Amino acid sequence: MASSSHRYFALLALFAVSLKFCYCQNETTDGAGWGTAGVTWYGEPLGAGSTGGACGFAVANPPLYGMVSAGGPSVFNNGIGCGTCFQILCNGHPACSRRPITVTITDECPGGPCASEPAHFDLSGKAMGALARPGQGDRLRSAGVLRVYYIRVECLYRRTNIAFRMDPGANPYYISFVVEYENGDGDLAYTEIQPAGGTFIPMQEMRSAVWKVNSGSPLTGPFNIRLTSAESHNVVVAYNVIPANWKPNETYRSVVNFK
């Protein structure tokens, strides 16, 4: 009888673990399970990493709040990884909280351990501290390269809509901007711009999350922007989001986002 009871409770435990695993898998955008990666950190111990980074995002402000990471070559993926979101779970060090955190890829980590491992995340100091138990952030930051579990998840920026930050070199003949805070996939397959009185024009991804269009004649606003997500192929249109009197370096917020 004792042996039967033991097997019964073992099966219950296995079933509970399976349910938890399936729940985590359902949050992924590509259906893959948890993988293993190396983790380091950079910048100030409580800071948001680099300002802007290779992706050009404003990393310290809401909704990112410094919970960001640079990605090694496989994660950054020549800029395609900009804006994608990952959960990271640390449980191999005594200071680990064993609770997952979510980070957004905002920068590139091209060398050192980032390039020597199949997957690597170089977290901001703030994000690294968030992996730790209360009061153990400094201990975890001084641990060197950590082994963690990671999984791709959908981005979810609550109460935040997609924003367009104009490139410093943008002008009426050359319109370029960074697309920020997309829910869902976090990366885009297509970006199209529609000037006043015109039709939608395909834009080119110049670098990372920056999209551009070169025009033989000046384009005038207000502009509509149509976005297509890379994996789910969902489409949203931000109407009149960039005004006629737009300026370089300014950020224009839409009233839409992917669900």
UniProtKB/Swiss-Prot annotation:
Ranges of residues in domain Expansin-like EG45: 52-160
GO cellular component: extracellular region; membrane
Biological process annotations from GO: anatomical structure morphogenesis; plant-type cell wall loosening; sexual reproduction
Bilayer topology: Peripheral membrane protein
Main location: secreted
InterPro entries, alphabetized: Expan_Lol_pI, Expansin/allergen_DPBB_dom, Expansin_CBD, Expansin_CBD_sf, LolPI, RlpA-like_DPBB, RlpA-like_sf
Signal peptide as annotated in the record: 1-24
Paired cysteines (S-S): C55-C82, C85-C155, C90-C96
Location relative to the cell: Secreted, Cell wall; Membrane
Stored SUPFAM superfamilies: Barwin-like endoglucanases, PHL pollen allergen
Pfam family, one: Expansin_C
Superkingdom classification of source: Eukaryota
Keywords assigned: Cell wall, Disulfide bond, Glycoprotein, Membrane, Secreted, Signal
UniProt keyword annotation of Membrane present: yes
Residues linked to a glycan: N26, N249
Domain (Expansin-like CBD) ranges: 173-254
Family the entry assigns: Belongs to the expansin family. Expansin B subfamily.
Primary role: May cause loosening and extension of plant cell walls by disrupting non-covalent bonding between cellulose microfibrils and matrix glucans.
Record's protein name: Expansin-B6
UniProt source species: Arabidopsis thaliana
Gene coding for it: EXPB6
